Amino acid sequence: MSIESEDKSLKWIMIISFIGLIDAIYLSYLHHLVSAGGGCPTQDLPGLDCGVVLASDQAKLFGIPVAWLGVVGFLTLIALSLDRYLNMDLERTYYNKILLPTTGIIGVVFGSYLTYAEAFIIHEWCPFCVVAFVLTIAATFFCISEYGYEIKELFNKNGIEKET
């Protein structure tokens, strides 16, 4: 991994995560709007009523709207990548190289469940939720392509790798 490659990847992670943050904030607003009895901009499109999705049981985790979790997830990716970008020479940002792909993977796993729920439980699609999921996958791709070896090295150091 070169400094230029890492620099480029971090910029992409920040750009993608910023767009995801805007989408997640909008989803949080829509969640509030739907909870207050309002509608969703896609409610007249067959199969694409985000209001139905945001009013479903799957739209909350322990009473917290999952859109808020998206805000936290994208903010975390932005903060970790910005910290690493500004302080590449500092040893303390080493952990950001572990936390970035880990955060992304958690987001992809959770987003996969939510996308499954849209398709097979709710039977409606929320276009803004799908955008958030695609952006999560894209940011995670850059995180893993740049720092995946760090996680592998961490497992190797701790003797977690299979012995052959």
Predicted regions span which residues?
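Membrane-interfacial helix-loop segments of redox and metal-homeostasis proteins
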Residues: 2-164
